[in-house]
Amino acid sequence: VAAIALVGCGERDKASRIGTAILWAIDNDRTWHDGRLRNAYAAGVVASGFAKLPGWWDNTQNKWLEDRYQVGSDNGNVAWAMLALLSIDDVSASSRFRDGAARLATWVAQWADTRGTGGFTGGTFGHEPTPDVRTWKSTEHNTDLAAAFGLLATRTGDSRWRDMATAAEHFVNTMWDPACACFAAGTAEDGVTRNPILALDAQVWPLMALAGAAKKFASAITTAEQRMSVDKGFSYGEDRDGVWTEGTGQMALLLELLGRTGEAKSLVAVIESQRSPDAGFYATSVRGLPTGFMLDTDPAKPRLYFRLPHLGAASWAALAERGFNPFTATKGLPQWRPSQPFSPIQVKCFFDFDRSEFGQSRRFCRRRMTSGLHPKADMIKWAAAARKEKPPTRNPTETP
């Protein structure tokens, strides 16, 4: 998000430094060479060797430990890296950032889901060589992916990315609940059962990221105002224990994009009240702000935002101030509209059709698609078999 905010502020060179670091991390993982990114990296100068991951020395066990979430790969985080690279690409004469985004997209595409209303699952959790697969689906993640795949399709002219965007957008649309005028947070591990948690970003982001959503789902703003507003700003969820600076910035940006400038400026004033001494912004106005979620690494503990300077909060504050939409890399709402939706199974088929390494599976897909026959049971069996095949080995510097 910081890279996109820098682009929005006209700081192309600084944004490119972050983009270059992202590309370097893709190519210099200690284990993976398949186009993925980790959820976190150690801060500092990028020099040589493998990308350094955050961790700590445990004196009791006398060894180096790493957080299982941080070493994993959430598809939503990868989508934001795609958006960052594509925002830099928009002001760059080189295609390397666009190519990097395509590499990330290729990795994410394998998580297209056939259950329920499709979309993409969460990614991976834990250490190599066999991290756990996240089978839940997130409204937020799929919103990010719809925007990222859509931008990539526009920049490259490759229709398969448009198909991916359509699949992600379709999932987000089906998470809308007219009864509460809100988006569900996503699904449980079964990929079907809705997660009832009400999260601010799941209400705001679709309206900024999906064409026509700001009008179609405008009542989500009213729901957020009625159920998540606090101290003239917004909280993460319904607890309303304090202001969530990042989310307040997101709502301010949405209102600015909708032409509701007065309301947006009022929220920017609330954000300014959360300035930290280092000229950054605190994540929240309270010591610990609940999200409604529990920690993946310790399900007995709640996931909180703490009153500490937060780069995400500063980045969204900048985006709100500049009126720059990170989902479009412009100062406007999305204008493109995906083509006629394909089923999740068809989208999965289109992706693997391009991978010649899949051999027989590829030919089976060709027969089904060219004949116009799409027996769902057969397609589900094919998709399951395709996931078990070993992915192609690539040189880390090779662009898919």
PLM region spans:
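Non-membrane alpha-helical segments in proteins
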Residues: 1-8, 18-21, 80-84
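Extended ligand-binding clefts on enzyme/binding-domain cores
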Residues: 27-63, 70-76, 92-249, 256-258, ...
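Intrinsically disordered, low-complexity serine/threonine-rich segments
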Residues: 347-348, 352-354, 359-378, 385-386, ...
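Aromatic-lined substrate-binding rim segments of carbohydrate-active enzymes
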Residues: 14-28, 63
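Alpha-helical support elements that line or immediately flank enzyme active sites
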Residues: 2-12, 203-204, 255
